[in-house]
Amino acid sequence: PLWGQSQDPLNEDQTTVRILEGDNSDPSIVRYGKSYYLVHSSFVYTPGLVVYKSDDLVNWVPCSTALTTFTGDIWAPDIVFHNKRFYIYFPTLNGKGKKTNMVTWADTPEGPWSTPVDLKIGGIDPEHVVGEDGKRYLLLSSGALYPLSDDGCSITGEPVRIYKEWEIPEEWDIEGVSMEGLNVKKVGEYYY
């Protein structure tokens, strides 16, 4: 389930509220007007990438489905609003074992959503980033920063590695070697 907190976490009287039932891992939220829109991993379920709407971050209702046909095993999507259009970037593992990242877009979060476009790059946890120059990029958990076309629907060049995966000692029993669940925001002159 996806959980929310209705009190200050340091307050002894805190209350935890379940806001969505089921497996809702890797949520991504965007605010548009007075409403919030959320997508989460949909894995192999079809329809996939259900878009939820909320005006209070507690009560959510489905408002559209970005994928109406099977696209593959989908996880860790990133929903963004840029230049008057909504985009969902997502990694997928198709039925033949190929990993790639795709994008679908719509003029409103209620859809209709476009047929997904294959960006032809592997990696997980895509994060849409806009540089100081207004150019668009897609950052992956490996630290690869790919330049995007102006419309955000194709990769236009080779990636720049902005950080490298961690060097893990061989004797450690660990699964991950890079950051996951990226969320990059610019505050002042720095990106966080």
Each predicted region: which residue ranges?
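Carbohydrate-active catalytic/glycan-binding domains of CAZyme proteins
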Residues: 2-192
